Amino acid sequence: GLGDVYKRQEESGVEKGIVYVITEHTTTGITVNESLPCVEKDLMECLDRIAPEDYPYHHNHYLPTYGTIGGNAPGHLKSLLTGNHCVFPVLDGTLKLGHAVDIYFCEYDGIKNRRYMVYVVGERG
């Protein structure tokens, strides 16, 4: 999960508001789900069935603007399916997530140096 989301909210001093988490990349996702290895595995297997690596995607050709072959179409599609952001309420100075809820940063294009942004907006105590 994204443990520093809690830290950022606490440091903000916001008592009532929202926390907004968004990725900066088009082949990553931000999603919310139960924090269990079996759920993570099921999610990835489902996404692999929907957007398999070996499909002949239109994106897998030379892209002059990038000077390379776009071989990451499955990553773009998986990102669309999981989404690129999530929003949670802050009440009484506490980030409100369900009992078994965790926030996931999902990488769909190999190991890379990636970033996401956390915005905390609201009324301070």
Residue positions per predicted region:
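Phosphate/pyrophosphate-binding loops at sites that engage ATP/ADP/AMP, CoA/4′-phosphopantetheine
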Residues: 8-19
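A short aromatic-anchored loop/beta-hairpin motif
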Residues: 38-39
